[in-house]
Design a protein with these regions (language model features):
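Mature catalytic domains of secreted/periplasmic carbohydrate-active enzymes
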Residues: 1-176
């Protein structure tokens, strides 16, 4: 069973575009993902893979990221968007190689700015609102509560009128 294939097929059946989220720098099960110590300490798995000096982000990209992206971009039909996250230590050349792969396999796929190094098609603004209209494409990335993902113990949520105000503010300034 392939849940992503089922989801992609159902999205198309319902007239929705389909895309993927991909975290470039948060793979806790890979020995080559560095933490960017001391700036971003604790962002990778130093318990199982403590040798920060020998971690090799390029090896991780070549061995895991590019093959996974190839799978995502070739097995699920047309991909409308790749929504990347956490590119803190990705070099410009690494971002370029990822972008080239996407352009070759899915030439119409949108790529957000979190591919890193200014190579996205549009900018992500996280947990804040713009102060003025921005003519360049951008997206506000705002949570509805206190967490990025589901937490059954979460009890802090923005009130509906606040979420409507935020959405109105974003759209009025040209954002998504």
């Amino acid at each position: 069973r392939d849940p992503m294939k089922e989801l992609a097929d159902e999205c198309r059946k319902q007239g929705l575009k389909f895309g993927f989220y991909y975290s470039l720098g948060r793979d806790w099960e890979d020995p080559d993902v560095p933490t960017n110590w001391p700036t971003k300490a604790g962002r990778s798995n130093t318990w199982d893979f403590p040798d920060e000096d020998n971690k090799n982000l390029q090896a991780y990209i070549d061995r895991k990221v590019l093959p996974q992206l190839t799978e995502l971009l070739t097995n699920y039909g047309e991909i409308a968007m790749m929504w990347f996250d956490t590119p803190e230590m990705v070099t410009k050349e690494q971002s370029r190689s990822i972008r080239r792969l996407i352009e070759r396999l899915q030439p119409h796929c949108l790529i957000n700015s979190r591919i890193g190094n200014g190579l996205g098609d549009y900018r992500i603004i996280e947990q804040k609102l713009m102060n003025e209209i921005d003519p360049k494409p951008w997206e506000a990335c705002l949570t509805m509560g206190a967490n990025w993902g589901y937490n059954k113990y979460d009890t802090v949520y923005k009130k509906p009128d606040m979420m409507i105000r935020n959405l109105t503010d974003v759209v009025s300034k040209g954002g998504n």
